[in-house]
Amino acid sequence: MDINQTKEAVKKEEGYRLETYKCTEGHLTGGYGHKMLEGETAPTDHAGWLVLFERDFARAVTGADDLLMLCPNIKDTARNIVVEMVYQMGAFGVSKFKGMLKALQDEDYKLSLIHI
């Protein structure tokens, strides 16, 4: 799976909402799972939400790559799973999956799945 397929998978999993809503954690959310930040104005159309999605997705890729710095040979599929996780939980949240990250560093993909 390439990164564009991952991007589309994230969109599908998150779903799309034009109007903001409270997510299960109580945060004001909209578009493709974008958590509204303090002082941020919600877009009024799909194009505006896409801009936020692209920014959020780029941050997820950067966050995943930072977490995977010690995994230079990681398979694309595993990297893309970490990108999806970072999109949903943030890099800090995913950093708590220490067993998974260590298994990825060791290229033990089966063990990494156990730690998710």
Question: Where in the sequence are the language-model features?
Answer:
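Extracellular cell-wall/glycan-interacting regions and their flexible linkers
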Residues: 1-8, 62, 66, 110
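Short, functionally critical alpha-helical segments immediately adjacent to catalytic or ligand/cofactor-binding
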Residues: 6-15, 81-86
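Catalytic glycan-binding domains that act on GlcNAc-containing polysaccharides
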Residues: 17-24, 73
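Substrate-binding/active-site groove segments that recognize
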Residues: 22-42
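Alpha-helical segment that forms one wall of the substrate-binding/catalytic cleft
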Residues: 40-71, 76-97
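Short secondary-structure subsegments characteristic of cysteine-rich extracellular domains
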Residues: 93-111
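Conserved small/polar residues in nucleotide/adenosyl-binding loops
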Residues: 114-116
